[in-house]
Amino acid sequence: MKKKVMMSFLAIVLILIIAGVTIGKSLMDKYSYSKERADLETYFHVSGDRAAIVLQDEVIEEQALIRGGRCYFDLDTVHRYMNEIFYVDREENLLLYTDAVETISAQLADNDGTYNMTEGVQDLGYPVCLVEGDTIYLAADYVKQFTNYDYQMYDKRVQVYTEWGERMQAEIKSKTAVRVKGGIKSEILKDLQAGDTVELLEQMDNWSKVKTDDALIGYVENKRLGVIDAVQETPVTDYEAPAYTNIALDGKVSLGFHAIGAKIGNSTFYEMASEAKGMNVIAPTWFSLCDELGNFRSFGENSYVDTAHKAGLQVWGVLDNFNYRNETKTPVDEYVVLSSTSKRQKLVDGIVITAVNLGLDGINVDFEQVASETGVHYVQFLRELSVACRKSGLVLSVDNYVPFHYNEYYRLDIQGEILDYVIIMGYDEHWHGSGDPGSVASIDYVTNGIEKTVSMMESSKVINALPFYTIVWTTDGATVTDEYLTLNNTADFLKQMSTQPQWDEITCQNYLEWQSSAGLKQVWLEDADSIRVKLNVMSANEIGGVAVWRLGYGTDLVWELIRAYSAS
């Protein structure tokens, strides 16, 4: 009997021991800290010679290339986060960087580490760039030659800083680990000792998101954190970019475009200039791209410039991409010219030399209907032309459409930095041949164009161009036709009307419509009343001046308004 009791007792004890061990193990499993370490390739989603990029305090989608112990970033990454000035010409195997004073060039493929500057050939000591398939990589150190940013390489990751400010720093008060997620079972990224510091990214109830000094982002228990301080970061200022020096006229610019279709048109200077009260710049349409090699045709004459100077006027010769094409019906694709460094340079050199030889004061670029795929090459052309004009003491201005999202590739923000003046063509809201009757330049359209442009640059660089014309629209069923009406012909036009125009508060223009045998006629007039309102908006935005398209279309009253505006 005693033996049976003893056996039962031992069995119960054994069961309790087993249960205790099981429960203890379960409790240990539940409450003990995992010692599993994270695989960094898996954590960062990298393999081979790729490394994650930690930009500021965030792992971004783009990755770095580590080659020969050196760090490279692909061109898109450089453009997006560091410096968008780098330009590539694959056909001519060139990597270019154009600042305010020069263009630095390097061989693109098979680069030996050298690059060319005005002061001579420089050597980075290893390839400036690598080309792998369709992807171009730039050496991080080469980018730093022209950019204020910082980077540090670590195992499977590169820390990049492009911005600096105040960060929160926490001291570790006892031994712990940074884990992938907030939980004791999460894998370990790094062990920390008492006295180490981490950047505090986000503080939560029990765990906080932190970044270690070697760019690992994870979580630490709050109870392991000690003193938290605000630390001011020190910005990188190693690179000092050459200044974009600009030429500015004394007072407002008052520019008149002089439409010239042949050299004989230069003889109309006195006729055109005599009407223009207060004008201080005349811009003859002399130059037009004439082939796909970088050549242009010219109607320029020294005698015209001399005469203009004696009349107290500056002369800015206009270079366009459409007049020769329209006159001769010769197809000229500006993409072919602007995407080629050698052709682009030929155009830049040619127009600047011609301008200097003619004694011009400036160059005005009027490239219209530039395709989006040409945009990056057009901007590079303007960069290179701005350097050449700066060296030659020429004013550089560029004509632009009113800015909208669909023409952002004209890059008014960049133009505002590199140019002397940015001219907004404050018209063509509804244009000839559009089949869409409406105002050529309503006040909202003009105001939005000015305000958007001013938001991207110094207001003193902005010039708003006014139309000295409007359009008479005829709608017959689904058919819409139109014809131009100039300011100087408007009075005679209205004398023929049996009805008089009424002021439209929405467009701030005098509006007239009537029924004719041809259909419904509509016209939003440009006259002294509408021009006065536009000039008031220009004054309110304190822009750099006014331009008019074109000389020969104006009236004494409108020119008197412009003279008063320019003198204010």
Question: What kind of region is each of these model predictions?
Answer:
Residues 239, 324-334, 468-534, 565-567:
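Glycan-binding loop/region signatures in secreted carbohydrate-active enzymes
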Residues 265-292, 350-363, 534-546:
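Catalytic domains of carbohydrate-active enzymes, especially glycoside hydrolases
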